[in-house]
Amino acid sequence: MPLNEIIPVIENLISRGYIKKQSVIDAILSVPRHKFISKSMESYAYVDSPLEIGYGQTISAIHMVGIMCEELDLDEGQNVLEVGTGSGYHAAVVSKIVGESGKVTTIERIPELFENSKKTLSELGYNNVEVVLGDGTKGYLENAPYDRIYVTASGPDVPKALFKQLNDGGILLAPVGAHFQTLMRYTKINGSISEEKLLEVAFVPLIGENGF
């Protein structure tokens, strides 16, 4: 399946103002989304909507990945934590933006998705991504502190462990809520957390000790 099928999607996202930064555009253009889903779903790979990946989980819509990358204000060399690997697609896009001098740690609680995403990311050469099996609501102290943290599932609130593992000056992005969810952006400045509501969203539930 040709990767150039994503070009009209990207053009639409740019025209709607969802994505602006060239680094985000280039990253989404370069990551083969069809490699992160099952063969039976490949024909839908470059449709801008969430897709089932099994185990009650989804691969995020392309526009949502773009929006989150924009709002995280990603840059080369950053240390990033993703909570909820899923297919590994979102981590791949982020890894392209932070580059070889950066690192993405991504945590997945479902063993089958952990194995699948780890295999896909490795085969495609995303060597700056470390996939961890565990409870993402606890974060991952081994690679902390993080310049950026983002959560790909919605919890009742943001686990305190994630704020503790966020660098000063860092940004944390997470959907918050049960049925009605809001994508929130938190910034840590001199140890204090400021928050900003971004938009209404729909994510799968955040499961874990500090989630649902």
Swiss-Prot record:
Q: Where in the cell is it found?
A: Cytoplasm
Catalytic activity, EC = 2.1.1.77
Where is it found, in Gene Ontology cellular component terms?
cytoplasm
State the superkingdom: Archaea
Give an example GO molecular function. protein-L-isoaspartate (D-aspartate) O-methyltransferase activity
Known catalytic reactions: [protein]-L-isoaspartate + S-adenosyl-L-methionine = [protein]-L-isoaspartate alpha-methyl ester + S-adenosyl-L-homocysteine
Q: Is Methyltransferase set as a keyword in this record?
A: yes
Catalytic residues, per the record, are S60
Its top-level enzyme class, in one word, is transferase
A Gene Ontology BP annotation from the UniProt entry: protein repair
Protein name (database record) = Protein-L-isoaspartate O-methyltransferase
Q: Which organism is it from?
A: Methanococcus maripaludis (strain DSM 14266 / JCM 13030 / NBRC 101832 / S2 / LL)
